Amino acid sequence: MKKTLAALIVGAFAASAANAAVVYNNEGTNVELGGRLSVIAEQSNSTRKDQKQQHGELRNAGSRFHIKATHNFGDGFYAQGYLETRLVSDYQSSSDNFGNIITKYAYVTLGNKGFGEVKLGRAKTISDGITSAEDKEYGVLENKEYIPKDGNSVGYTFKGIDGLVLGANYLLAQKREAYKTATATPGEVIAQVISNGVQVGAKYDANNIIAGIAYGRTNYREDLATQDKSGKKQQVNGALSTLGYRFSDLGLLVSLDSGYAKTKNYKDKHEKRYFVSPGFQYELMEDTNVYGNFKYERNSVDQGKKAREHAVLFGVDHKLHKQVLTYIEGAYARTRTNDKGKTEKTEKEKSVGVGLRVYF
């Protein structure tokens, strides 16, 4: 029997839970282990920062594992601890990108099925799941430039109404100085890193309709030691939104994502950026899906430099087994930058890859 697109999307969001193994379940306590190994063979000119030439590589593409412990108190109350890692290299010279085990998320949760939950620690924020565009590796949406999608935070999430998620987050300082230098004091927030921030958002996903919006205000520590414009970011006010509709009988989802942000700089001109991105996801046949999206993004400085980016992504994925996924994905982006008195600069990014994910 052919699966509906709604079922596929719900399954994708619950992939980690569906593939996790229950290693302990007794007297209201449940412990799960899960994760995936992911490898991609690619041709790309944007694997590393400032890369110019296109190269072929076989590398890690988000391999991870997680452990989740849930303790049920009764009457719908529960506590949960969650730890998720990544297997990545700290060195740009490591071509396969496998390396140390690092912590991606680590948090504790106290909640009630009817009243919502409070989450404390390094976790995703409400803005993480707002946009609808699908990708496996080369996502062209840079949502974190508008609103941070994770970090050290205190968050509240309410899911008491079917299909509706409401959330709010307060972000704390992400990095602090460890040593005393001529320009740094131990314990102070590192320059140009998040000092604090707030986010609120809502997403509705039911009755074939998807709608979501999030707003965030993020403050950054000024870099007093840097005299040029690179150290002047003060505050970013950003918003993200999505609107989509599922044609269940056709196995088709169409969506429109968008974002807007204004960056305030210390004693310097402000910056504005926005994007719009129509996209689709289509169930070609059982266990095979086609997806893609287009993005137009503009970034400008008051009476100054302007950059326009056009980007497109297209992919096909196929489930070989309930715990094995393979995909082909490609992305192309072109950015044109104009600055007063200077020749227009054009940059292009091209990537195509074949990936394999094995869940456990």
Swiss-Prot record:
This is Outer membrane protein P2. It comes from the Bacteria. One of its GO terms (biological process) is monoatomic ion transport. The gene is ompP2. Homotrimer. Belongs to the Gram-negative porin family. It is found in: Cell outer membrane. Keywords: Cell outer membrane, Ion transport, Membrane, Porin, Signal, Transmembrane, Transmembrane beta strand, Transport. Residues 1-20 form the signal peptide. Forms pores that allow passive diffusion of small molecules across the outer membrane. It is a multi-pass membrane protein. InterPro entries: Gram-neg_bact_OMP, Gram_neg_porin_domain, Porin_dom_sf. GO terms for molecular function: porin activity. One of its GO terms (cellular component) is cell outer membrane. CDD domains: gram_neg_porins (cd00342).
